[in-house]
Amino acid sequence: MSDRISIIGGGSWGTAIAYLLAINGKKVLMYVRDNNQKDSINKKRVNNKYFPDHQLPEGIEATTDIKEVVSFSNIVFLAVPTHATRAVMKKINHLLNEEQILVSTAKGIEEVNFLRNSQIIKEYCNNKIAVLSGPTHAEEVIDGLPTAVVVASRDKEVAESIQDIMMSSTFRVYTNPDVVGVEMGGAVKNIIAVAAGIADGLGYGDNTMAALITRGLHEMSRLGVHFGGKLLTFAGLAGMGDLVVTCTSNHSRNRRFGIKVGKGMNTEEALSSVNQVVEGVRTTRAVYDWYQGKKLNFELPITSQIYQVLFNDKNPLDAVNELMLRGPKHEIEEVVDDVNW
């Protein structure tokens, strides 16, 4: 078990992870890009950009030297958005030693190559990789509210080592070998959360939200299983758990973005208004572009309509109408096949 932890990324989630680990007695070094942010953390014990009202433990220090943070420990958390992962790996791949574990925390899919975060990381190193996911709003983690997550790795010892350093009375960590399922759940749920926000913005009710979450889970699991994920993973924290919290919480950037679109803003206006990374926008485009022209045994109707709303200025009301008037379907084909109905 390591007593020193490196975190690349000084955003809300990187700060929450640092806070949690420091409370657990670890020495944490965070890489941030801004000198003012570094000085605020080191001198005032506050991340002035993301958590100005939260005092950080003494065990946390910040640096703008990425070499320093990579060499600080044998466990390196990558707390950056998916679209920044490749650039970070280009900077650090030659600094890594073979003993270091990389922990991916992003929930997205790279647009051009349709790669999960762990796949991007693997292009640059042979290090062991873990993926952290689940229903986690940084604001609640740093407030000490009970939270449960999942850490996935193909190496059981790696998963358990991350579980060991993060577990606390307010933060419960489960392990799972299904890296594909955990990453796909974390990424694709953002699309459904945008849809949920749009539904809220249009003034729809609880029935609509329940339908979106349930049929959204269907899309998530179908897509994830297609790429090799395990179906039951989508019933867990990285699937249903993350989907529920992201579709219903006011902390959710994807939901807040969707609400603004539902109330009439276009994509650029809504992104500017949220003023934070909204992974669901890029993920919608990545999944839709991959999906086009493929002959598959499943459909992605919600994803397809959200793409049209975000990138082709389709009226959200028309998108809802088309979803509701799709041809009749069985709810779950496997059940029909199983009973020979």
From Swiss-Prot:
Its EC number is 1.1.1.94. Pathway: Membrane lipid metabolism; glycerophospholipid metabolism. PROSITE patterns: NAD_G3PDH. Pfam families: NAD_Gly3P_dh_C, NAD_Gly3P_dh_N. The active site is at 189 (proton acceptor). One of its GO terms (biological process) is phospholipid biosynthetic process. Keywords: Cytoplasm, Lipid biosynthesis, Lipid metabolism, NAD, NADP, Nucleotide-binding, Oxidoreductase, Phospholipid biosynthesis, Phospholipid metabolism. NADPH binds at residues 12-13, 33, 107, 138, 253, 277, 279. InterPro entries: 6-PGluconate_DH-like_C_sf, 6PGD_dom2, G3P_DH_NAD-dep, G3P_DH_NAD-dep_C, G3P_DH_NAD-dep_N, NAD(P)-bd_dom_sf. Transmembrane segments: none annotated. Sn-glycerol 3-phosphate binds at residues 107, 134, 136, 189, 242, 252-254. SUPFAM superfamilies: 6-phosphogluconate dehydrogenase C-terminal domain-like, NAD(P)-binding Rossmann-fold domains. The keyword Lipid biosynthesis applies. GO terms for molecular function: glycerol-3-phosphate dehydrogenase [NAD(P)+] activity; NAD binding. It comes from the Bacteria. GO terms for cellular component: cytosol. It catalyses: sn-glycerol 3-phosphate + NAD(+) = dihydroxyacetone phosphate + NADH + H(+); sn-glycerol 3-phosphate + NADP(+) = dihydroxyacetone phosphate + NADPH + H(+). It is found in: Cytoplasm. Catalyzes the reduction of the glycolytic intermediate dihydroxyacetone phosphate (DHAP) to sn-glycerol 3-phosphate (G3P), the key precursor for phospholipid synthesis. Belongs to the NAD-dependent glycerol-3-phosphate dehydrogenase family. This is Glycerol-3-phosphate dehydrogenase [NAD(P)+].
